[in-house]
Amino acid sequence: MIDYIKGNITELNPTEVILECYGIGYRILISLQTYEGLNGKSDAKVYIHHYMREDEELYYGFATKDERELFRLLIG
């Protein structure tokens, strides 16, 4: 399981960030709060919630562990 991804921000918009880590670009869905924290930065550490089912695999990213835990409580 992935706890966080740390890397260079190659793309950023209010709903997602692309983090490049060792030559791999990870597409991570983010909240507006996380977007505001990342805006203007070139590097980031994003805490990950990995969502996977038969036809879909997504990474949700959060600026803090607390934000991720709240998300997990809401979907749980």
Where are each of the predicted segments found?
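Short coil-to-beta-strand transition motifs
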Residues: M1-I5
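Long, highly charged, low-complexity intrinsically disordered interaction regions
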Residues: E11-G76
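Conserved hydrophobic positions within beta-strands
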Residues: G7-I9
